[in-house]
């Protein structure tokens, strides 16, 4: 089985909650909107983000059957029409070189899982770099370091100090495709039974440790250890040189109950449980402190 995180999802009659599919590249999703005018609403949304000093990075999926020129036109459209600041592009229909060399996208943040470094247009100043690599190696090695696997010190040191001059590396300990940060210290094994695929979907390589108990525990020692590990994970992530990304809800230990592939779960498995914000206020306050420290 491949260690790579899965990108293309086959719903087999279930809801495609993540939306990874071919097509509809030039229209905002109406069901996400509160009004009957999704174009105006999305434009207003972007404007409000910019007024608050927040950039908008869209994730878009282009499978093999998608023409790379269509990919280019889609990104140009969202940049010019909606003023989106950047894109995390997925799928085999993506030509990184075509996107990186396009004049319209020259100052746009572009994030890829892989690309040829020699094809990057170099900026005059390192701080102006706008090409980034999603860095699953950080997740894999730092999770192993966190749970004290052998011979991980040198790998951890490499990831902490890694910050290339001509492109960025996006460091993260969790994303939507895998365990949440809470679940990485709560489960040794995936629990994807709700996906109705006999628990065979999702990665088997989670680099997690349940601290001695599989799943939720009322033992204060187990719970205390898990909270310390989550704090260590955030401290390591936010003290590393590359840009840090964390999954929404990790700042208050949101759980997916061990499901590491919640692509078809439009329910409490993948929703954010905001009640945990009070229960895990200690973690939330620590994350805020670390962001300020960074």
Where are these regions (language model features)?
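Long, K/E/R/D-enriched contiguous segments that form extended
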Residues: 274-276
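Conserved alpha/beta catalytic core and glycan-binding cleft of carbohydrate-active enzymes
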Residues: 96-248, 252, 261-265
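Active-site neighborhood of glycoside hydrolase catalytic domains
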Residues: 40-41, 48-124
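Core nucleic-acid recognition elements
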Residues: 255
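Catalytic cores of secreted or luminal carbohydrate-active enzymes
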Residues: 278-294
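Aromatic- and acidic-residue-enriched carbohydrate-binding clefts of CAZyme catalytic domains
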Residues: 5-51, 64-81, 194-215, 266-269
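Conserved hydrophobic/aromatic pocket- or pore-lining residues that grip, position, or stack substrates
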Residues: 1, 25, 59
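A structural motif corresponding to the C-terminal end of an alpha-helix
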Residues: 45-56, 81-83, 236-243, 289, ...
């Amino acid at each position: 089985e491949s260690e790579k995180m899965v990108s293309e999802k086959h719903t087999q009659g279930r809801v495609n909650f993540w939306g990874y599919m071919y097509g509809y590249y030039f229209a905002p999703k109406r069901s996400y909107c509160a009004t009957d005018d999704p174009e105006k609403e999305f434009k207003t949304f972007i404007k409000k983000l910019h007024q608050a000093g927040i950039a908008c990075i869209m994730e878009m999926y282009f499978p093999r059957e998608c023409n790379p020129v269509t990919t280019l036109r889609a990104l140009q459209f969202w940049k010019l029409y909606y003023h989106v600041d950047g894109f995390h592009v997925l799928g085999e229909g993506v030509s990184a070189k075509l996107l990186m060399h396009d004049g319209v996208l020259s100052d746009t943040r572009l994030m890829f899982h892989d690309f040829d470094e020699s094809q990057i247009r170099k900026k005059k100043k390192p701080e102006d770099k706008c090409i980034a690599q999603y860095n699953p190696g950080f997740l894999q090695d730092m999770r192993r370091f966190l749970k004290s696997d052998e011979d991980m010190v040198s790998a951890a040191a490499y990831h902490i100090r890694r910050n290339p001059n001509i492109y960025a590396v996006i460091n993260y300990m969790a994303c939507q495709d895998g365990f949440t940060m809470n679940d990485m210290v709560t489960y040794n094994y995936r629990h994807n039974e709700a996906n109705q695929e006999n628990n065979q979907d999702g990665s088997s390589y989670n680099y997690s440790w349940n601290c001695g108990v599989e799943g939720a525990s009322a033992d204060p020692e187990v719970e205390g250890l898990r909270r310390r590990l989550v704090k260590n994970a955030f401290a390591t992530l936010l003290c590393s040189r590359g840009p840090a990304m964390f999954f929404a809800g990790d700042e208050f230990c949101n759980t997916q109950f061990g499901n590491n592939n919640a692509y078809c779960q439009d329910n409490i498995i993948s929703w954010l449980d905001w009640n945990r914000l009070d229960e895990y206020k200690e973690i939330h306050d620590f994350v805020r402190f670390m962001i300020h420290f960074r």
